[in-house]
Amino acid sequence: MNYQLLWKSAIFSVSSMMAISAVQAAPLNVMTEDYPPFNMQGEGGKIVGLSTEVVEELFKRAGVEYKLTLMPWKRAYEDTLGTPNTALYSTTRTPEREALFKWVGPLVNNNWVFFSSSTANITVKSLEDAKQYSVGGYNGDAAAEYLKAQGFAKLQLAANDTANVKKLEAGRIDLWATGQYLAPYLASKEKVASPKPIFVFKETQMSLAFNKDTPDELITKLNEILAAMKADGTIDKINAKYQ
C-alpha cells in the first residue's frame, strides 16, 4: 500500500475542507448580470439560466453556502475585483482579465457573433470587413472591449444588449456584436424578427471569476468538481435544456 500517496490525499482533502470553511465564515457573495439564457431573472424573482444551473450544482456538490445576486455588469465586476469572498459569472476569461481574478471553469461555450438584421444584405468574412459598418455592443461587455482593442472606430455602446435589438431592427446600427445564444433569445423576447448570424469573430468560453483573495485550495476543489460534472454527463444534460 502506498502510504505516502494516502497521506498526501488525506492532507489535500483536509486542506480543501478548511478552504471551504474559511470562505464560509460568511456565505459567498455570488453576483451575476441579466444575460439570457445563461443568467436571468425568472418567475418570482428567482435567478435562473444555463450557467446558473451549473453554478448551483457545483456549489451543492462542494458544500459551499452562497448568496446569489443579480445586478448591472459593471457594478458586479468592480465589486468582485475589490471585495473578498465574492465571485462573478458568466465571465469571459480574456488575457486582460486573467491576472485580475482566480478562475473556475469553463462553465459554458459562448461564441461571439456579428448579427445583421433579417432583411440586410451584408457579407462579413473577417474582422477587417466588419470595420466599415456601425457595430452595436454594450458598456463593460468583453466582446465590446475586444472590438475596441481591434480598432473598431464605429462601435456604438448601449447600456445593455436589449437596446441593441431595437437599434438593429430600426437600422440605427448595421451589425450587432453579441453572444450566439443571446441575440435570438432577445429578439424573441422583444417580438422582432430574429437577426441573421453572419460571422463568428471569436470562439469564447465563460467561467466563474473569484476575487483574488479566495483560497487556492477552494479554487482547485471547485475545478475538480466541475471536471467531474462534465465527465458524468451533468453539464451535457443542462446544456440540452437550452438548445
Residue spans for each PLM region:
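Sec/Tat signal peptide C-region and signal peptidase I cleavage site
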Residues: 18-27
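Short beta-strand-to-loop elements that line the ligand-binding cleft
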Residues: 65-72, 137, 153-160, 167, ...
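A ligand-binding cleft/hinge motif common to bilobed small-molecule-binding domains
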Residues: 78, 91-100, 174-202
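Flexible hinge/capping segments at coil-to-helix
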Residues: 116-134
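Extracytoplasmic small-molecule ligand-binding "clamshell" domains
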Residues: 26-100, 232
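Ligand-binding clefts/hinges and TM-proximal coupling segments of bilobed small-molecule sensing domains
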Residues: 65, 142-159, 227-243
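Periplasmic-binding protein-like
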Residues: 33-34, 110-113, 188-223
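Extended ligand-binding regions for polar small-molecule ligands
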Residues: 49-61, 208-242
